Amino acid sequence: MATTHLDVCAVVPAAGFGRRMQTECPKQYLSIGNQTILEHSVYALLAHPRVKRVVIAISPGDSRFAQLPLANHPQITVVDGGDERADSVLAGLKAAGDAQWVLVHDAARPCLHQDDLARLLALSETSRTGGILAAPVRDTMKRAEPGKNAIAHTVDRNGLWHALTPQFFPRELLHDCLTRALNEGAAITDEASALEYCGFHPQLVEGRADNIKVTRPEDLALAEFYLTRTIHQENT
């Protein structure tokens, strides 16, 4: 199928293990309902008609993915991921074909809402650099004293945002920025930070705070609650 300027490829780095979950099974393969977290995350992307393909970067020794129904989906491409997130994203970008824009989404972020995704994708019509889903910080923020669990001072939360995913950029721009940042030893914690390092200023698209990443054991029950609530709302 030929791609158009509106078609989008998504990249899902899924080669990590997530030791904070305290389980032997990588967190993306834990189940919520009758699907794994990874499947929830990927199907949320494929639910939008502009997302024509999802490239999933998995660990070379991963034996779990092939057992999922997702492995046989015609819109899924699988590549070997790397040791770091940025390496996996770059591997995914190389398999993204001629898509002009790419989404990058966390494998363990299963609660993405379609209205948030649609507003993020609309950036391709108005922006040359793209942007990210993000949620304004609402809690009081404290800076700790170096090496201590003691408060140094309160941080002004005005203008602070929690970075979420998906993150959405022109494919070539993201590839070039990630490559440069890695080659120059920059600290890259998400895709937007690579663009920031290269002098770009991606936009912030406010998204729902319940678009959580499953990182700790208690997050699993919370994600299950959010997903169950969403399914109930869609069916009423």
Curated annotation (Swiss-Prot):
The record marks 20, 27 as: Transition state stabilizer. One of its GO terms (biological process) is isopentenyl diphosphate biosynthetic process, methylerythritol 4-phosphate pathway. Pathway: Isoprenoid biosynthesis; isopentenyl diphosphate biosynthesis via DXP pathway; isopentenyl diphosphate from 1-deoxy-D-xylulose 5-phosphate: step 2/6. It catalyses: 2-C-methyl-D-erythritol 4-phosphate + CTP + H(+) = 4-CDP-2-C-methyl-D-erythritol + diphosphate. The keyword ATP-binding does not apply. Coiled coil: none annotated. It comes from the Bacteria. One of its GO terms (molecular function) is 2-C-methyl-D-erythritol 4-phosphate cytidylyltransferase activity. Keywords: Isoprene biosynthesis, Nucleotidyltransferase, Transferase. InterPro entries: IspD (IPR001228), IspD/TarI (IPR034683), IspD/TarI_cytidylyltransf_bact (IPR050088), ISPD_synthase_CS (IPR018294), Nucleotide-diphossugar_trans (IPR029044). Pfam families: IspD. The keyword Membrane does not apply. The record marks 157, 213 as: Positions MEP for the nucleophilic attack. Its EC number is 2.7.7.60. Homodimer. Catalyzes the formation of 4-diphosphocytidyl-2-C-methyl-D-erythritol from CTP and 2-C-methyl-D-erythritol 4-phosphate (MEP). Belongs to the IspD/TarI cytidylyltransferase family. IspD subfamily. This is 2-C-methyl-D-erythritol 4-phosphate cytidylyltransferase.
